[in-house]
């Protein structure tokens, strides 16, 4: 089923941990008809993992199980996927990929306030500096559907919400 057969679009909001994905995804879900799907929560609640990695304090995600779980929802449309990565998803099922970016010093503060270990903060900060999420999005999807947005201030976050909400409105008019 292509996007021309869905009534609502599918959006991925991705970025390094601490860039504001969950906040933005929740806000977009509140202002549109889309369902926010936080992959971290889905993985935990549905046991879509191989176990917990004590060193990194995160689940070792079973990507095949995640895809099996999500595919029916994505085929129907109307999903906001909130995850740090995007390359797992089929290009035919995704209409917009939003990559949130944050200055590494601000990102460091956010991750520190979450209680992340120094090693985890450094790894995520390096990923942000090296633009890992952005490069993955550009390699995995048509560049026309990949949007890079800054996410450092309240004003930027409000602007991002407005832009995505308007995009959803336009998508619905054209499909």
Curated annotation (Swiss-Prot):
Name of the featured protein: Adenylate kinase isoenzyme 6 homolog
Region of interest (LID), ranges: 113-123
Subunit and partners: Interacts with small ribosomal subunit protein uS11. Not a structural component of 43S pre-ribosomes, but transiently interacts with them by binding to uS11.
Annotated EC: 2.7.4.3
GO cellular component, as recorded: cytoplasm; cytosol; nucleus
Entry coiled-coil feature ranges: none
Keyword list, A-Z: ATP-binding, Cytoplasm, Kinase, Nucleotide-binding, Nucleus, Ribosome biogenesis, rRNA processing, Transferase
Family: Belongs to the adenylate kinase family. AK6 subfamily.
UniProt cross-references to InterPro entries, sorted A to Z: Adenyl_kinase_AK6, P-loop_NTPase
A Pfam family hit: AAA_18
Subcellular location: Cytoplasm; Nucleus
Entry keyword annotation includes Iron-sulfur: no
């Amino acid at each position: 089923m292509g996007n021309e057969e869905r009534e609502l679009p599918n959006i991925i909001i991705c970025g390094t941990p601490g860039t504001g994905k969950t906040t933005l995804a929740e806000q977009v879900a509140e202002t549109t008809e889309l369902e926010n799907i936080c992959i971290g929560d889905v993985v935990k609640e549905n046991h879509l993992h191989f176990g917990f990695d004590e060193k990194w304090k995160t689940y070792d995600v079973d990507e095949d199980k995640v895809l099996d779980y999500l595919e029916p929802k994505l085929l129907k449309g109307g999903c906001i996927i909130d995850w740090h990565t995007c390359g797992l998803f089929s290009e035919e099922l995704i209409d917009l990929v939003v990559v949130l970016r944050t200055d590494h010093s601000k990102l460091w503060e956010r991750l520190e306030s979450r209680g992340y270990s120094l090693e985890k903060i450094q790894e995520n900060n390096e990923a942000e500096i090296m633009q890992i999420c952005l490069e993955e999005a550009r390699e995995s999807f048509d560049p026309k559907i990949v949007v890079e947005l800054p996410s450092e201030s309240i004003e930027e976050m409000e602007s991002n919400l407005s832009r995505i909400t308007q995009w959803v409105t336009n998508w619905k008019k054209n499909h």
